[in-house]
Amino acid sequence: MSSQQYQQQRRKFAAAFLALIFILAAVDTAEAGKKEKPEKKVKKSDCGEWQWSVCVPTSGDCGLGTREGTRTGAECKQTMKTQRCKIPCNWKKQFGAECKYQFQAWGECDLNTALKTRTGSLKRALHNADCQKTVTISKPCGKLTKPKPQAESKKKKKEGKKQEKMLD
């Protein structure tokens, strides 16, 4: 290798080395120049807790509906708002559409009142609804009801009738 080639290679190496140092210095100063964001200050609000009305179904007595919320406070930006809600259609409405109860089996028939009763304990309340812890319901004793015939029992009856016709 000639001295001229050697010097040329050395200059290239020195230029690359200086470029690397320059890039590292630029990156370091860019990171140092960034300001750390101060944590957001938590505002202590004068606003009170939201108080929600009961869910009012859009149509019928269950399904989708709306509820209104209000809160108090001198410096509140929003004191009223409307929220979507849903009333399950399989819940017993007489205890409040937002209260779900777990019921025990029906009790024995009371001959004096001709009613049988059962109690339910609160299983779930939607949207902080005001629900009773336990409820009691009554219904007339009435006749003993037979369970509805299942599809299988209908098939058995049909097969039995077919056999009777064949024997005739």
UniProtKB/Swiss-Prot annotation:
Positions of the UniProt region annotated as Disordered: 139-168
Q: Give the matching InterPro entries.
A: Midkine_heparin-bd_GF, PTN/MK_C_dom, PTN/MK_C_dom_sf, PTN/MK_diS_sf, PTN/MK_N_dom, PTN/MK_N_dom_sf, PTN_MK_heparin-bd_GF_CS
Region named Chondroitin sulfate A binding: 147-168
Region described as Chondroitin sulfate binding: spans on this chain: 92-99, 123-131
Q: How is it modified after translation?
A: Phosphorylated by NEK6.
Classification via SMART domains: PTN
Residues making up the signal peptide according to the UniProt record: 1-32
GO molecular function annotation: carbohydrate binding; chondroitin sulfate binding; chondroitin sulfate proteoglycan binding; glycosaminoglycan binding; growth factor activity; heparan sulfate binding; heparin binding; integrin binding
Q: Which residues form a coiled coil?
A: none
The answer on whether this UniProt entry bears the keyword Lyase reads no
Q: What is its main location?
A: secreted
Q: Name one GO cellular component term.
A: cell surface
A GO BP annotation: ossification
Which pairs of Cys residues are joined through disulfide bonds in the record?
A: 47-76, 55-85, 62-89, 99-131, 109-141
Spell out the Pfam families in the cross-references: PTN_MK_C, PTN_MK_N
- Write the record's keywords in alphabetical order, separated by commas: Disulfide bond, Growth factor, Heparin-binding, Mitogen, Secreted, Signal
| Known tissue expression | Expressed in brain. Hardly expressed in bone. Abundantly expressed in the growth plate. Intensely expressed in the cartilage matrix that forms the hollow for the secondary ossification center. Is expressed selectively by the osteocytes of the lamellar bone, whereas it is hardly expressed by those of the woven bone. Is detected in the matrix surrounding the osteocytes and in the canaliculi of the osteocytes. Is distributed on the surface of lamellar bone.
- Residue ranges annotated as transmembrane are none
Subcellular location per UniProt equals: Secreted
Q: How does it assemble?
A: Interacts with ALK and NEK6. Interacts with PTPRZ1 (via chondroitin sulfate groups); promotes formation of homooligomers; oligomerization impairs tyrosine phosphatase activity. Forms a complex with PTPRZ1 and CTNNB1; this complex inactivates PTPRZ1 protein tyrosine phosphatase activity through PTN interaction and stimulates tyrosine phosphorylation of CTNNB1. Interacts with ITGB3 and ITGA5. Forms a complex with PTPRZ1 and integrin alpha-V/beta-3 (ITGAV:ITGB3) that stimulates endothelial cell migration through ITGB3 'Tyr-773' phosphorylation.
* Recorded family membership: Belongs to the pleiotrophin family.
**Stated role:** Secreted growth factor that mediates its signal through cell-surface proteoglycan and non-proteoglycan receptors. Binds cell-surface proteoglycan receptor via their chondroitin sulfate (CS) groups. Thereby regulates many processes like cell proliferation, cell survival, cell growth, cell differentiation and cell migration in several tissues namely neuron and bone. Also plays a role in synaptic plasticity and learning-related behavior by inhibiting long-term synaptic potentiation.
The molecule here is called: Pleiotrophin
State the organism of origin: Rattus norvegicus
